[in-house]
Curated annotation (Swiss-Prot):
Species: Caldicellulosiruptor bescii (strain ATCC BAA-1888 / DSM 6725 / KCTC 15123 / Z-1320) (Anaerocellum thermophilum)
Keyword Lyase: no
Gene: hisG
Reaction it catalyzes: 1-(5-phospho-beta-D-ribosyl)-ATP + diphosphate = 5-phospho-alpha-D-ribose 1-diphosphate + ATP
Organism taxonomic ancestry: Bacteria, Bacillati, Bacillota, Bacillota incertae sedis, Caldicellulosiruptorales
Subcellular location: Cytoplasm
Name this polypeptide is given: ATP phosphoribosyltransferase
Amino acid sequence: MITIALPKGRLAQQTVELLKRASLVDIDISEESRKLIIEDTQNSLRFLMVKPFDVPTYVEYGVADVGVVGKDVLLEMNKRVYELLDLKIGKCFVALAGPKGISEALLKKPDKTIATKFPNIAKEYFENVRGEDVKIIKLNGSVELAPILGLSDMIVDIVESGRTLKENGLEVYEKLYDISARLIANRASLKLKTQIDDIINRLERMIEE
């Protein structure tokens, strides 16, 4: 049986729908379900429902053979896992954003303060792309509040539609990275290469359609 770590929430549902279209599973996963382990015995698959930032850890240590996780998490955590496939779902992007209408002034400002859930991504971007040393404040949610309340000048965050930014008087200054869900594995998973290759091949056919 292959164990797959899935991030709780909408991405898990999207992944299962993709697996169903590829005739790999016969189960449904509800976003409201409290079950943490879900088995599809008919297809010899077991799903672990974990927090998105925990998916690479479960895969890295071999508790899960493969996992599905956003590219943003992989960029932030830099775990020893292998990207097998871009699933083309959960699409969004990482952006530098801030108060509307003053982007030029803030981008030129020295000693910037950046609030973000992704301190490593923010640090790498400012150091290696912009060549700047900035102060980074890590937050775990509602990052948009930081520049509104004066905690930071700007934010680095995930953007899907941009609606949340707009409703809070913010706008995208720069697009940093395109993000989508990735299928990942660890070195130990090579012992299941035949089964995993079958999953990859079937998913690739669905993605290309």
